[in-house]
């Protein structure tokens, strides 16, 4: 029995001596070094000795390492995101194109246009998206557009509840690498493809400091280049030249509403009371005089939508005129069909874009649509209607002549 005890004692004291004899000293030294290093690092940072100029090139290999890490992070954090079945719907692509032209092209370029010298003077530089989007799947793109990227000029989506808007941007981004300048111009601005001026101007390189920094295929030092522009009054890209909407688009027909309603809606978008990252960007750039001018320009014109009417729906007509009393749903026409009653609060629905109406129903049902002014029972109403009933109401109102009594 003595031998096993001696062996155990050797294991305990010889090979693995007591903690305070072997590890305590080195642990104290390591802790001291860590604290000292942290203090020195904080002192150096606070002193201003380290400069962060965008005019200097990034260290060799840093940009590639950061981009690879960013792509891996986006894939990891987006793997559980559900992709909508209608991701490639034309109306999504069109809406995304208009928003991209307004908000993103100035930094990332666009089909037919390179990147401006101002954007390419950032560090890190924004990539030329038509050339690099193939590295990202739909889920990764959604995560990036919705969340942005820290320590870059890439913002998060301003309205986090509007995932539907983000998916429209993703729908466009997935198709952009395959677009030429003519198709892009038609989608983004509403200009007929045959009149797209940019298509007649082939891209040519321009000289820029550090143009050889990093992989050139990820950036576009070419003219014509996308420019920073104001979104003030930029209505036609989504709503069409006359405000009645665009064929196959999802933006609403503005001409159905009164100037009062349009002005109040722009105010609600600007304040965030009615969440929409797309509309808020435009609305906050408008002065009160701009809002008054735009409301007067589009309001009460009642122009038929370019896509024509859709077939009516008997169930929708019955709900619009009678409601669903058994579930406490009042007739839609009790608010929306009374001319002159609260023009700021109750929009006209007859002849409205069916895609827009369906989307608004979904937003009300999800509790994220917001409101313009005053009393708003729509969240409760949409909860009490089945999806089939909501779709029927949409078909009914979309089938009516523009501006008719609902």
Predicted regions and their residues:
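Extended intrinsically disordered, low-complexity coil regions enriched in Ser, Thr, Gly, Ala
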Residues: 123, 257-280, 309, 350-375, ...
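Soluble periplasmic/extracytoplasmic beta-strand elements of cell-envelope proteins
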Residues: 128-130
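Periplasmic/extracellular electron-transfer cofactor-ligation site
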Residues: 97, 101-124, 150-153, 179-180, ...
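Generic hydrophobic alpha-helical scaffold/packing signal
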Residues: 266, 280-283, 295, 317-320, ...
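Acidic, glycine/polar-enriched metal-coordinating patches/loops
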Residues: 1
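Glycine-rich, acidic and aromatic/proline-enriched surface loops and short helix-turn segments
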Residues: 147
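Long, contiguous C-terminal modules that act as interaction/assembly or targeting platforms
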Residues: 359, 363, 370-376, 384-406
């Amino acid at each position: 029995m003595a031998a096993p005890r001696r062996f155990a004692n050797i294991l305990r004291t010889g090979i693995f001596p007591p903690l305070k004899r072997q590890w305590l000293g080195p642990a104290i030294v390591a802790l001291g070094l860590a604290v000292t290093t942290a203090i020195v690092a904080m002192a150096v940072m606070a002193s201003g000795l380290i400069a962060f100029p965008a005019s200097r090139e990034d260290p060799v290999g840093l940009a590639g390492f950061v981009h690879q890490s960013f792509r891996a992070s986006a894939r990891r954090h987006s793997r559980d995101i559900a992709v909508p079945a209608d991701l490639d719907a034309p109306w999504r692509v069109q809406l995304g194109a208009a928003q991209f032209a307004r908000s993103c092209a100035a930094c990332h370029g666009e089909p037919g246009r390179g990147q401006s010298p101002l954007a390419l003077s950032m560090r890190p530089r924004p990539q030329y998206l038509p050339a690099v989007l193939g590295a990202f799947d739909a889920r990764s793109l959604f995560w990036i557009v919705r969340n942005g990227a820290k320590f870059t000029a890439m913002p998060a989506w301003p309205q986090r509840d509007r995932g539907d808007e983000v998916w429209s941007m993703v729908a466009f981004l997935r198709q952009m690498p395959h677009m030429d300048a003519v198709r892009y111009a038609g989608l983004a601005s509403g200009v007929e493809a045959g009149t797209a001026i940019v298509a007649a101007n082939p891209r040519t390189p321009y000289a820029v400091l550090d143009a050889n920094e990093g992989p050139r295929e990820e950036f576009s030092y070419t003219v014509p280049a996308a420019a920073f522009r104001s979104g003030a009054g930029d209505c036609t890209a989504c709503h069409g030249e006359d405000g009645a909407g665009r064929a196959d688009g999802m933006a609403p027909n503005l001409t159905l509403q009164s100037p009062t309603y349009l002005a109040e809606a722009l105010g609600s978008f600007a304040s965030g009371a009615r969440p929409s990252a797309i509309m808020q960007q435009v609305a906050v750039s408008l002065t009160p005089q701009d809002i008054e001018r735009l409301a007067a320009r589009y309001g009460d014109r009642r122009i038929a939508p370019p896509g024509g009417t859709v077939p009516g729906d008997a169930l929708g007509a019955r709900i619009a005129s009678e409601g669903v009393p058994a579930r406490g749903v009042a007739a839609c026409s009790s608010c929306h069909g009374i001319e002159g009653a609260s023009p700021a609060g109750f929009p006209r629905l007859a002849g409205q874009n069916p895609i827009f109406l369906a989307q608004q129903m979904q937003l009300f049902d999800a509790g994220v649509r917001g409101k313009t002014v005053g009393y708003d029972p729509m969240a409760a109403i949409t909860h009490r209607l089945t999806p089939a009933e909501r779709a029927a109401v949409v078909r009914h109102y979309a089938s009516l002549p523009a501006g008719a009594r609902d």
